Structures are given as structure tokens and as C-alpha cells.
């Protein structure tokens, strides 16, 4: 995955939460980050919803969210556009999915027991991953790794 700090505007990086090599944004910033990434020629490398607190983080769900691989007949700019369109569609499905919303509420209730006064909107972040044309990424391998991590917890 690519380091977004090398490509994205400073104002978008300033509103991100960074932990290690991962950058995360709030829901309100997602479309702007997607648009800026597309303009820079960065493809979506997937994403994960997390509750982030000073004490740690908790994934909203263990399902992997990765766009499809680049097709042989697809140019890089075409793939970049498609990867972000698939990502936007996945975001919308997540926001419309009542089961996921309920899971988030259950997780957040546990977090609130240890973090007094914390509001859900202040803790919900979306970790985004990026790819460049120079990277050859095996999405199926990523999915297996992410799902095995989820199954082990």
C-alpha cells in the first residue's frame, strides 16, 4: 500500500488520524479524500471502519472492503476511477446496512464504559489504503490475510 502523505494535499492529511503507516478519516471527509486520490492517480486499495480512542482501536467489522483487481484490458486511469467508484458504493452499503450500524452501536457501548464522555462521531474513523500504478497488488491474498486476522480474534 502507498503512503498517502506523498500524494495527498496537506489539508486532507491534517484532518486525518495517523497510527503507524495507517491514515484514517472521518465519514465527512471520505468523498473529498477519494476525489483527491483520483486526481493524483491513486487507486483505492481498500478500507476499514474503526473506532479509535487514545487507548487503542476496534474494527467495526471483520469483513474486508477491497475493490476488484485491475482487469487486463483496463488502463490505469480507468482502474483508478473504477476502484474509487466501487469504494464509494461499499461506503454507501455500509452506511445503509442496519446490522452493521447495530454492531457499531454494541461495540461503541463497550468503548464508552472505559472512555467517559466519548461520542460515537468522535471515535469513528475510516482507514484508507492506496495503490499506485507501480504496485502490483494481489487483492485475493489481502482478503485472505484480513479475514484470517478476523477469524483469529
Regions of interest found by a model, annotated:
Residues 31-32, 54-62, 134-144:
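Short, solvent-exposed polar/charged micro-motifs at secondary-structure junctions
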Residues 27-56:
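Amphipathic, interaction-prone secondary-structure segments
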Residues 91-148:
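Amphipathic alpha-helical binding modules
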Residues 1-27, 33-34:
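Long, hydrophobic N-terminal alpha-helical segment
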Residues 3, 21-28, 70-74, 78-86, ...:
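Alpha-helix boundary/N-cap detector
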Residues 12, 33, 83, 87-91, ...:
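Generic structural signal of hydrophobic/aromatic residues within well-ordered alpha-helices
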Residues 48, 53-97:
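Amphipathic alpha-helical packing elements
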Residues 150-153:
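Short acidic DE-rich linear segments
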Amino acid at each position: 500500500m502507498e503512503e498517502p502523505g506523498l500524494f495527498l494535499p496537506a489539508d486532507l492529511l491534517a484532518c486525518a488520524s495517523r497510527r503507524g503507516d495507517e491514515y484514517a478519516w472521518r465519514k465527512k471527509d471520505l468523498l473529498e479524500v477519494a476525489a483527491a486520490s483520483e486526481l493524483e492517480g491513486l487507486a483505492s486499495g481498500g478500507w476499514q471502519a474503526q473506532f479509535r480512542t487514545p487507548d487503542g482501536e476496534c474494527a467495526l467489522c471483520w469483513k474486508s472492503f477491497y475493490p476488484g483487481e485491475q482487469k487486463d484490458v483496463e488502463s490505469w486511469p480507468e482502474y483508478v476511477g473504477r476502484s474509487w467508484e466501487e469504494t464509494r458504493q461499499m461506503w454507501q452499503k455500509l452506511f445503509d446496512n442496519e446490522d452493521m450500524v447495530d454492531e457499531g452501536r454494541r461495540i461503541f457501548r463497550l468503548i464508552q464504559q472505559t472512555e467517559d464522555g466519548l461520542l460515537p462521531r468522535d471515535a469513528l474513523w475510516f482507514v484508507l489504503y492506496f495503490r499506485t500504478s507501480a504496485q502490483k497488488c494481489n487483492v485475493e491474498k489481502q482478503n485472505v490475510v484480513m479475514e484470517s486476522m478476523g477469524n483469529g480474534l
